[in-house]
Amino acid sequence: MLTIAMPKGRIFGEALELLRKAGYTLPPEFAESRKLMIEVPEENMRFILAKPMDVVTYVEHGVADLGIAGKDVMMEEERDVYELLDLKISKCHLAVAGLPGVRMNQIAPRVATKYPNIASSYFREQGEQVEIIRLNGSIELAPLIGLADRIVDIVSTGRTLKENGLVELEKIADVTSRLIVNPVSYRMKDEAVDELVHRLSEVIPQ
């Protein structure tokens, strides 16, 4: 049986649709279930529903054979997992944003983000020394209350930035969801994993 860690939320719905297109029979009530672990005996699969940031942890520690994780999570945390496939769902991008017309503080510039490693690496590559302030939510609030000069966050439609009076200043990287696998699981269950990869690759949107 393959155990697959899936992120809750919007990505979950898109991933389910992709699995169904690939020919996997999943019960209609699957998307509405409040269970955190669901077995589908007909497909010899078990699904674990988790927070997006936790999916990689489950796969790395082997409690899940595979997982679906955003490229942003993969970039932020170096983990002992293999990236098998770009599923090309949940498309968005990482960006630097701030208040329009407001320059960075030249003495002690601060950047708020839930991606401290990505932000540190990006500004270092730009030759800028900044203080990184880690936040777990409502990142857009930071420039409005003077906590930070800039933010680094995921941007999808840009609506949240606009509604909070912020503008995108620099694009860092495109982000999509990826299929990842535990290295040991890949060796032990290679046939099942390869079949999943093949079937998904046939229906991935271009």
UniProtKB/Swiss-Prot annotation:
It is found in: Cytoplasm. Pathway: Amino-acid biosynthesis; L-histidine biosynthesis; L-histidine from 5-phospho-alpha-D-ribose 1-diphosphate: step 1/9. GO terms for biological process: L-histidine biosynthetic process. Its main location: cytoplasm. GO terms for molecular function: ATP binding; ATP phosphoribosyltransferase activity. GO terms for cellular component: cytoplasm. Pfam families: HisG. It catalyses: 1-(5-phospho-beta-D-ribosyl)-ATP + diphosphate = 5-phospho-alpha-D-ribose 1-diphosphate + ATP. It is an enzyme of class 2 (transferase). Keywords: Amino-acid biosynthesis, ATP-binding, Cytoplasm, Glycosyltransferase, Histidine biosynthesis, Nucleotide-binding, Transferase. Its EC number is 2.4.2.17. Belongs to the ATP phosphoribosyltransferase family. Short subfamily. Heteromultimer composed of HisG and HisZ subunits. Lacks the C-terminal regulatory region which is replaced by HisZ. Catalyzes the condensation of ATP and 5-phosphoribose 1-diphosphate to form N'-(5'-phosphoribosyl)-ATP (PR-ATP). Has a crucial role in the pathway because the rate of histidine biosynthesis seems to be controlled primarily by regulation of HisG enzymatic activity. This is ATP phosphoribosyltransferase. It comes from Geobacillus sp. (strain WCH70). The gene is hisG.
